[in-house]
Amino acid sequence: MGQHVSNITVIATPQAPETKYLRVEYTGGYDDEYIRFFEAENIHSGDIGSEISPPFCLTRDTTVKQCASFLSPEAKKKFVIVPGEPCKSLSFRPGSILDLQKIPYGTESYVLDGTRCRFINIDYLYTDPDIKRCCNKESDKDCPEIFSNNYETDHCDTIMSSICLQTPGSLPCREWLEKKREVAFDTYMKVCSDHLDANYCSDFVDYTRPDNFGYSDAAILSYCSKHRNNPNCWCVTTPKNDKLFSLELALGPKVCWLHECTDKSKDRKYLLFDQDVQRTNCKYIGCNINVDTLRLRNSVAELIAKCGGSIAEDTVLGDDSYNKEAKLPSFFSIIPVCIVLLCLFVLFYFLRIYDAKVINSNTINVYRK
């Protein structure tokens, strides 16, 4: 509505040479506007373990060579350019970066879209203390993103493998293991071969199954071969003998009935993967049977148990209704016993009478007239 740009002026700031202002003047009595922008002037040498992002916006009118001119010769040997964040630049100030999202009225035609220059250091040695510091999360100062991205990429795998052999229980190592890369599995396979009882080995076994169970199985077999006297290993290293072989023929796989295998409180890391799978498919139900006498005659087995006792004696205590039902057979089992005893008493009584001697007596004749 009559507002037009009458003049554009660049204002430098001596205190911050790379920070400048664009003064936009309008006709019609409108107030001037100031736009802050940045222009690269410093030459960056780059410290080891850092990245360089000079205030230079790459647009269609600029080149990577212009952006790289702000790196020292030594830095150019170590750093490579990667995509940076989006930026806006003044067309008449190539490489400048505007410090605002909303473009003032009348200046739209002078603004170009681009991406900021960004360089990362690829000249890292895995023995360098800085890369170890970044990957092990000791400090994130000057750490490039490839070494501080929570192990999403494999750039830290080599250094973390050496670190986690020494400190496998540390939080960074466990976060690295959680990414489930094979180099981490190989590292923890070596550790858990000697320290399977450690809690981080439980995570290791869980992460390897089912796709990479070979790593955890190798660690379990190695550990249990060195600790045969450890009850936790008895499902894996059960002594081989004829008795066990016969039991397996009769009862099925030992993982379904051997206590060292069936104990639900046992950590899965003490079972091989196929044993762990087999245990979930077992159809056996354990129970206790009390036998008084066992008689074997050829192929006939005769079990003799004490059945006359109260059923309630072997009943697990539960709610009241269950106990009452369990005690009913105990009451009714007394009645037939009493009847039998009564019958025996009556029979004995009559037999006693029948067997008694006859009393001698004289015959008395009585006549009635």
From Swiss-Prot:
Primary location group: virion
Q: Which Pfam families match?
A: Pox_G9-A16
Annotated GO molecular function terms are: lipid binding
Keyword Membrane assigned to the entry: answer is: yes
Q: Which residues are annotated with the lipid modification N-myristoyl glycine?
A: 2
GO BP of this protein: membrane fusion involved in viral entry into host cell; symbiont entry into host cell
Role, per record: Envelope protein part of the entry-fusion complex responsible for the virus membrane fusion with host cell membrane during virus entry. Also plays a role in cell-cell fusion (syncytium formation).
Q: How does it assemble?
A: Part of a stable entry-fusion complex (EFC) which is at least composed of proteins A16, A21, A28, G3, G9, H2, J5, and L5. Formation of the viral membrane is necessary for the assembly of the complex. Interacts with G9.
The protein's name in its UniProt record? Virion membrane protein A16 homolog
Its source organism is Fowlpox virus (strain NVSL)
